[in-house]
Amino acid sequence: MSEPHLLIDAGNSRIKWALADARRTLVDTGAFGHTRDGGADPDWSRLPRPRGAWISNVAGADVAARIDALLDARWPGLPRTTIRSRPAQCGVTNGYTTPEQLGSDRWAGLIGAHAAFPGEHLLIATFGTATTLEALRADGCFTGGLIAPGWALMMRALGTHTAQLPTLTTDIASGLLAGAQAEPFQVDTPRSLSAGCLYAQAGLIERAWRDLVAAWQAPVRLVLAGGAADDVARALTIAHTRHDTLILSGLALIAADAADPATAPD
C-alpha cells in the first residue's frame, strides 16, 4: 500500500488536517489552533509517516512557521508543498483575471466540490471569518465569486464600532436564537443583532443563488461549508447540501495528481 498524504488547511480561525489514503479517502482528521495558547498541538504520534504534506495556508507566515515546526518535530525532513491557485488544475479552470490572487483555500475547495458533485452547476458558500461564494459550472469553469464579512465578523464590527450594542460571539448568538420564535423580528437587542446579521448572511446567499440560476438558466446546487453553516442553514428558504471537507478533499486530489497525473479528474 502506498504511503498516505498529510493534508493541512490553515484558515483564518484554526488549522484542520487529514490523512488521505491511496483512494483519496480521508481516514483520519483533526484540528488545532494557530498558537499553543489556542489549544493543544495535534497528536500525530500514532500516524504513519506520510508521503508528504500538502498545505493550504491563508493565515500568514507565523502559522506557516508553526506548521513547519510541528512537521519537523514529528517527521524530520518530510517533503511539503504549500499550494497556490493555478489557471487550471484537477479539472477546474480558474476564471480570475489574475488566477494566483484566488485564495488557496478557495481553490482547493473548488477542486473538492467539482469532484464531489460531478456534472452539476454549483454555488459554494463557505462561512468562516469571511463568507465566500464561488460559482462553479458543471464543466469545471470557476466563473467568479463574492467575499463578505462572516457572521462573527459582522457582529464583532457592530459591537466594536457602536457605543451601546454588545459584542457577541457566534456561540452566544446561536444560543440566543436557538429558542427564538418563528417571527424573524426579535424583542431584545442581543437577539435583534444576532438575527439581523444572520439574515444578512442568508439574504446574500439566496440573492446570489437566484441570480446565478437566472444567469445560467439551469439548476444550481447550493453547497454550504464552514463553522456557521448550521446557523445560516436554519435561516435559508432554499434547498442546500452540507459538505465540510471540500478543502481537504481538494488537497487530496491535488496531492494525488502530483504523485500520479494520470489519476487526476478530467
UniProtKB/Swiss-Prot annotation:
Keywords: ATP-binding, Coenzyme A biosynthesis, Cytoplasm, Kinase, Nucleotide-binding, Potassium, Transferase
EC number: 2.7.1.33
Reaction it catalyzes: (R)-pantothenate + ATP = (R)-4'-phosphopantothenate + ADP + H(+)
Coiled-coil intervals, chain numbering: none
Primary location: cytoplasm
Localization, UniProt: Cytoplasm
Active site residues of this protein: D105
Gene Ontology CC annotation, any one: cytoplasm
Residues that bind ATP: D9, A10, G11, N12, S13, R14, I15, K16, T129
GO terms under biological process: coenzyme A biosynthetic process
InterPro entries found in the cross-reference section: ATPase_NBD, Type_III_PanK
Taxonomic superkingdom: Bacteria
Cofactor binding comment, as recorded: A monovalent cation. Ammonium or potassium.
Quaternary structure and partners: Homodimer.
Name this polypeptide is given: Type III pantothenate kinase
Native species: Burkholderia cenocepacia (strain ATCC BAA-245 / DSM 16553 / LMG 16656 / NCTC 13227 / J2315 / CF5610) (Burkholderia cepacia (strain J2315))
